[in-house]
From Swiss-Prot:
Enzyme class at the top of the EC tree: translocase
Gene this chain is encoded by: ndhA
Protein name per the record: NAD(P)H-quinone oxidoreductase subunit 1
Complexes and interactors: NDH-1 is composed of at least 11 different subunits.
Positions of transmembrane segments: 27-47, 97-117, 128-148, 166-186, 204-224, 266-286, 308-328, 347-367
InterPro entries (alphabetical): NADH_UbQ_OxRdtase_su1/FPO (IPR001694), NADH_UbQ_OxRdtase_su1_CS (IPR018086)
Keyword flag Chaperone: no
Source organism (scientific name): Synechococcus sp. (strain WH7803)
Main location: membrane
């Protein structure tokens, strides 16, 4: 695993410099990673919701939000405040415990998955050696929460929506994992930092999208299905199921579903950026940038510039994919449930298996180009 800056140790040493003991410093550190992840996830959601409203308005030749702040940038905050003050209703015949636990099981694994997303060589909360495996494991918890919410609502539309959500998630989880496995095979690591580092040799030409074009398409299609974005929004199809598993929810419980959906979309876009688009890497080699500045690669100026712009590059790549996902919402029709399951089991799964086998063969035949 690539060595990186130990954020916990650096934080503890800084506090010890102010006279705090090592134990006190570590105690203060404990809640900070999750707080940072939560803030980053919420900010990402606010930006994405505003972008979706404005882009959707542009596609439909409308103006969109414009009164809540300049260009309507405060509209997502207004939406959140509205949901915060709405009454929290639990249906009379619903299972109260499962009804409350369902949204929590949906949103918590998605937020925890942000722990493994690197925004730079040393800029991540936790450089877990099995980060990809951790993310896949956490994402497999979400269908349980969706099915639980649909069942606990004691509503036929909610139950059908929960069953659809669970079936859809399971169907697309497997080809998604196989697509990621091909990338892991090339980088020889389950660490997201190592996967990005493997793509930083020759700028844009090193990105995995050129060596894994089929895997990239499989991953992106499966990610959209996991996020329940059009054309894969069958679990909450308004014309068929009212609002699916969300039908009986209101107030902050509904807000958790809303939040989880957008956090998952931004997370999926960030992971595509990390796995296939070079993450924090520049489109040109860093050596070229250092040459233009007349500095060595290890010079402090070059390190500061690459560190700052690495964050920008990761976010820009991710939001380009978010933009594409928003456009797809308004340009593609919803598929039927049988078409959705056929696509996952009869097309994407065999294609992902073939892609994995071809990647293994190419790794043996061309070890330098495919990470042998």
């Amino acid at each position: 695993m690539s060595p990186g800056l130990d954020l916990e140790q650096s934080f503890s040493q800084t506090l010890e410099g102010f006279g705090l003991s090592d134990q006190a410093a570590r105690l203060i550190w404990l809640p900070l990673p999750m707080l940072l992840v939560l803030v980053a996830a919420v900010v990402g959601v606010l930006v994405t919701v505003w972008l979706e409203r404005k882009i959707s308005a542009a596609v439909q030749q409308r103006i969109g939000p414009e009164y809540a702040g300049a260009l309507g940038v405060l509209q997502p905050l207004a939406d959140g405040l509205k949901l915060l003050v709405k009454e929290d209703i639990i249906p009379a015949r619903a299972d109260g415990l499962l009804f409350t636990l369902g949204p929590v099981l949906v949103v918590v694994p998605v937020i925890l998955s942000w722990l493994i997303v690197p925004f730079g060589q040393n800029l991540l909360i936790s450089n877990v050696g099995v980060g990809i495996f951790l993310w896949i494991s956490l994402s497999s918890v979400q269908p349980i929460g969706l099915l639980m919410s649909g069942y606990a609502s004691n509503n036929k539309y909610s139950l059908l929506g929960g069953l659809r959500a669970a079936a859809q998630s399971i169907s697309y989880e497997i080809p998604l994992a196989l697509a990621v496995l091909a990338v892991v095979m090339m980088s020889n690591s389950l660490s997201t930092v190592d996967i990005v580092s493997q793509q930083t040799g020759a700028g844009i030409l090193s990105w995995n999208i050129w060596r894994q074009p089929v895997g990239f398409l499989i991953f992106w299609i499966c990610a959209l299905a996991e996020c329940e974005r059009l054309p894969f929004d069958l679990p909450e199809a308004e014309e068929e199921l009212v609002a699916g598993y969300q039908t009986e929810y209101a107030g902050m419980k509904f807000a958790l579903f809303y939040l989880g959906s957008y956090i998952n979309l931004v997370l999926s876009a960030l992971l595509v950026s990390v796995l296939y688009l070079g993450g924090w890497g520049f489109p040109v080699p860093v050596e070229w940038l250092a040459g233009w500045l007349g500095q060595s690669v290890d010079a402090p100026l070059v390190q500061v510039i690459t560190g700052a712009t690495g964050i920008v590059m990761t976010v820009l790549k991710a939001y380009l994919l978010v933009f594409i996902a928003i456009l797809l919402r308004w340009t593609t029709p919803r598929v039927r449930i049988d078409q959705l399951l056929d696509l996952g089991w009869k097309f994407l799964l065999p294609l992902a298996l073939v892609n994995l086998l071809v990647t293994a063969a190419l790794k043996l035949a061309f070890p330098v180009a495919f990470g042998g």
